[in-house]
Amino acid sequence: MRLSFFTALSAVASLGYALPGKLQSRDVSTSELDQFEFWVQYAAASYYEADYTAQVGDKLSCSKGNCPEVEATGATVSYDFSDSTITDTAGYIAVDHTNSAVVLAFRGSYSVRNWVADATFVHTNPGLCDGCLAELGFWSSWKLVRDDIIKELKEVVAQNPNYELVVVGHSLGAAVATLAATDLRGKGYPSAKLYAYASPRVGNAALAKYITAQGNNFRFTHTNDPVPKLPLLSMGYVHVSPEYWITSPNNATVSTSDIKVIDGDVSFDGNTGTGLPLLTDFEAHIWYFVQVDAGKGPGLPFKRV
């Protein structure tokens, strides 16, 4: 199905779903919060050209000061990728000896507002599971860099056999990270952890249920961020569960009580229930514990529609 965002937007208001998500009555723990705040800094680092075009052995750094904990680990780049495909997928593989982790990070888009304004959403069969359909652009972004990344991961993991694999991303990078983690779990990395901040929906209900069943998924939304509301439910797209919904305002420190844990692939208790996606709500999109995209260069000018 191929529909533009604005053509389909009005359809969502009339939707009804029989299987709403369940809002858990617990706060996250302090140790969980520490993990959430830490891994997003790897996503933040992926926006810096110096990191996604780094030389092997270079330390990750964030000149805008939004990844201090990552800098403190001394994590080094073992592989990076950028501008190598028509999808402009960018990111890096880093080794964090302090936390015994191999990190695969995907950069978000430099022009996400234009992506929202102009987006068309087409399903494709990724071959991950029976009945599973993924969004074509997100799947293509992963598929075009997959072989090289898997080759590099094999070498890095062989050198660090007891390290965990962590896949991270923000915004469109989170969508690619979600599909990458899903695919990698079936290719020798079954325990790969996913930290997806502000991810759009990546596929249909069958794919969402498949990814959810794999486990080790941490998907974050923030107040009324419009990007996780896309592609629309009316277009056949469903989220991975659970959702960690951050309710604190922009530019504010997040406490354990500010994060609500919501189970279910279709839920109106969290971000989805805050209304239709609006282009005026983008401040919520860039603040996930830190200003995640502070390191990005100039993107395309915002297109008024």
Curated annotation (Swiss-Prot):
PROSITE patterns reported for this sequence: LIPASE_SER
GO cellular component, one term: extracellular region
Keywords for the protein's UniProt record, in alphabetical order: Disulfide bond, Glycoprotein, Hydrolase, Lipid degradation, Lipid metabolism, Metal-binding, Secreted, Signal, Zinc, Zymogen
Principal subcellular localisation of the protein: secreted
UniProt keyword Glycoprotein, yes or no: yes
Disulfide cross-links: C62-C67, C129-C132
pH dependence: Optimum pH is 7.5.
Top-level taxonomic group: Eukaryota
GO MF annotations, alphabetized: diacylglycerol lipase activity; metal ion binding; monoacylglycerol lipase activity
Family named by the database record: Belongs to the AB hydrolase superfamily. Lipase family. Class 3 subfamily.
Annotated function: Secreted lipase strictly specific to mono- and diacylglycerol, but not triacylglycerol. Shows the highest activity on 1,2-dibutyrin substrate.
Name of the protein this chain belongs to: Secreted mono- and diacylglycerol lipase A
Species in which this protein is naturally found: Penicillium cyclopium
Source organism phylogeny: Eukaryota, Fungi, Dikarya, Ascomycota, Pezizomycotina
Gene name of this polypeptide: mdlA
